[in-house]
């Protein structure tokens, strides 16, 4: 619900004018405040997990209640063509943190694995990547991350924490080093490598049946087999079972953990109190750093399955458990925004809200939909080309600096947040690497009418599925699809029966010639254009093709973080509270803020 406190507060005129003066200084680069922390805006970045762009009232949903996010949009700038750089958690967040496509850091699929699978894998965001947190830290900011990380933990030994948030510019971390999955809820079916797990269990049963058959045959005298051979085969079967069950049999204990900085504080985590713990930590962080400046990246666990929702919100929405979780997320965000206002920081805080990618259409429990709604846009999570997989909310808020109620339809990217916040604090983006994002400051303020992106490239794993051309002279936004997933069943708009749609192989269609859409006239990508229906068809295909060729010249080989050797669970890398393998601990209290 909207807070009366948020509606009724008004800061003194002198304080209200301060952000405006700072903004003009940063924009025009005519002054550089060196010492006064008050001249640097606090940065609050809020990212939902798996939220569909059609799930919010401010984006057209009139059946889910999201008053706090809607108010943020009313008081700020709302982007309607805001795009994730990847359609899955790990690569999208890597791109967000670094302002670079995830494949540039090796943080995207080179095989069947498209996201990190274990806390105890050795893959993760490389140490030589620069996050916006590191740059802000160098400019005197306190930098905190609360919530989901999913960018890896260790490289070579338990505790080296080479991929840990504290090794990437954050000086405080509280949350999940991994991500929520169904495995975190004992009452849900398995999710992490569920198909492989079922296959390994089948092999184990086959081996056990063979060993029992040999033992029975030898005992009954049906055939002659030495006891040593039977014992040896039984040993092999046991070793095989232990080799996979030691990881897959304890997914909840290995992956579903909470950490504070370098220490595991809860293993496995108690889902029912997690939301309260995250809220308590966020409010506490704001209060501790209210004299600023601070960066707080609030990386929400909502609204990823298993949709852990407190009793206060269960059964309250019109859309089942998913809707309940969305409305709880909005309430939690409202509490955080209240903390900003209660500490007198509303007019000195740059706030941003988004989702890491589109809603998860395939997330179902029988006939119940457990994933988000992507509005008019085709596709969803896991689909790198279709709009539903990559179009996300984008809301920016800074009273007195950004115009209230402004709506921008220009193509923008999650990768743009990196150079945007770096510019706001007076920093510079790295000059020794490709940065794919562009600062949104001129666009948000109204100094520029057009996005700096002429072309945007949309990947599924390391496969280029589509490209977007924002034609400057006409204003048209053309979208070329080179590869699309094959929906199952045909025409369903998703790949039901599997976790997400594939990026390559037999489950995709390669289009020769490519599909072409004009998003400015057909944002739902319902009517592909042809040479007969669009006179510019061949010219557009050729121009986008040339841009793709130029883009590919910027690519260079890097170590693959999702390689099989990096993805595998390694017991010596497992974060552990206590003595491995007897890892167990719980936080005191219920997390009530």
UniProtKB/Swiss-Prot annotation:
Signal sequence annotation: 1-33
Keyword Hydrolase: yes
GO CC terms in record: endoplasmic reticulum lumen; lysosome
Cofactor entry: Ca(2+)
InterPro entries linked: Alkaline_phosphatase_core_sf, Sulfatase, Sulfatase_CS, Sulfatase_N
Sequence positions that bind Ca(2+): 49-50, 89, 356-357
Keywords: Calcium, Glycoprotein, Hydrolase, Lysosome, Metal-binding, Signal
GO molecular function, one term: arylsulfatase activity
Chain positions found as 3-oxoalanine (Cys): 89
Active site: 89, 150
UniProt modification remark: The conversion to 3-oxoalanine (also known as C-formylglycine, FGly), of a serine or cysteine residue in prokaryotes and of a cysteine residue in eukaryotes, is critical for catalytic activity.
Top-level class of the enzyme under EC nomenclature: hydrolase
Family indicated by similarity: Belongs to the sulfatase family.
Stated name of the protein: Arylsulfatase D
Name of encoding gene: ARSD
């Amino acid at each position: 619900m909207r807070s009366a406190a948020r509606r009724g507060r008004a800061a003194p005129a002198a304080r209200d004018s301060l952000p405006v003066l700072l903004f003009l200084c940063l924009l025009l680069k005519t002054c550089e405040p060196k010492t006064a922390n008050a001249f640097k805006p606090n940065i609050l970045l809020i990212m939902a997990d798996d939220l569909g762009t059609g799930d919010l009232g401010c984006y057209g949903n009139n059946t889910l209640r999201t008053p706090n996010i809607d108010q943020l949009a009313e008081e700020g700038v709302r982007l309607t063509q805001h795009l994730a750089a990847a359609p899955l958690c790990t690569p999208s967040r890597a791109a967000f943190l670094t302002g670079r496509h995830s494949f540039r850091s090796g943080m995207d699929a080179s095989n069947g694995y498209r996201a990190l699978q274990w806390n105890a894998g050795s893959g993760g965001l490389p140490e030589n990547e620069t996050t916006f947190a590191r740059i802000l830290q160098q400019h005197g900011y306190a930098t905190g991350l609360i919530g989901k990380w999913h960018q890896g933990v260790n490289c070579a030994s338990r505790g080296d924490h080479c991929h840990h948030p504290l090794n990437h510019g954050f000086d405080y971390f509280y949350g999940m080093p991994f991500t929520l999955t169904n495995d975190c809820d004992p009452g849900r079916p398995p999710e992490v490598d569920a198909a492989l797990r079922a296959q390994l269990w089948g092999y184990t049963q086959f081996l056990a049946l063979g060993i029992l058959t040999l033992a029975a045959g030898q005992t009954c005298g049906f055939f002659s087999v030495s006891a040593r051979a039977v014992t040896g085969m039984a040993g092999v079967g046991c070793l095989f079972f232990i080799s996979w069950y030691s990881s897959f049999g304890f997914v909840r204990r290995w992956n579903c953990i909470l950490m504070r900085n370098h220490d595991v504080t809860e293993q496995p985590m108690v889902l029912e109190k997690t939301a309260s713990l995250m809220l308590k930590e966020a409010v506490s962080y704001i209060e501790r750093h209210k004299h600023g400046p601070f960066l707080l990246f609030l990386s929400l666990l909502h609204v990823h399955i298993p949709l852990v929702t407190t009793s206060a919100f269960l059964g309250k929405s019109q859309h089942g458990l998913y809707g309940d979780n969305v409305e709880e997320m909005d309430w939690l965000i409202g509490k955080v925004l209240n903390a900003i206002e209660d500490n007198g920081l509303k007019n000195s805080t740059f706030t941003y809200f988004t989702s890491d990618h589109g809603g998860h259409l395939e997330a179902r429990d029988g006939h119940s939909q457990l994933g988000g709604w992507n509005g008019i846009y085709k596709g969803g999570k896991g689909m790198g080309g279709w709009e539903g997989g990559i179009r996300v909310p984008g809301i920016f808020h800074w009273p007195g600096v950004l115009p209230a109620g402004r709506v921008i339809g220009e193509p923008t990217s999650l990768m743009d947040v990196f150079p945007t916040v770096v510019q706001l604090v007076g920093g510079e983006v790295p000059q020794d690497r490709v940065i794919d994002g562009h600062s949104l400051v001129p666009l948000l303020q109204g100094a520029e009418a057009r996005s700096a992106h002429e072309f945007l490239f949309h990947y599924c794993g390391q496969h280029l599925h589509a490209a977007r051309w924002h034609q400057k002279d006409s204003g048209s936004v053309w979208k070329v699809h080179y590869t699309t997933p094959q929906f199952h069943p045909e025409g369903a708009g998703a790949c039901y029966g599997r976790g997400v749609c594939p990026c390559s192989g037999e489950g995709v269609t390669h289009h020769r010639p490519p599909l072409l859409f004009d998003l400015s006239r057909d944002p739902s990508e319902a009517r592909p254009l042809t040479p007969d229906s669009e006179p510019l068809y061949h010219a557009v295909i050729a121009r986008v093709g040339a841009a793709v060729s130029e883009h590919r010249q910027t690519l260079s080989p890097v170590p693959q973080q999702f390689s099989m050797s990096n993805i595998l669970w390694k017991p010596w890398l497992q974060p552990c509270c206590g003595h491995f393998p007897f890892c167990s601990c719980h936080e005191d209290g219920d997390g009530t803020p």
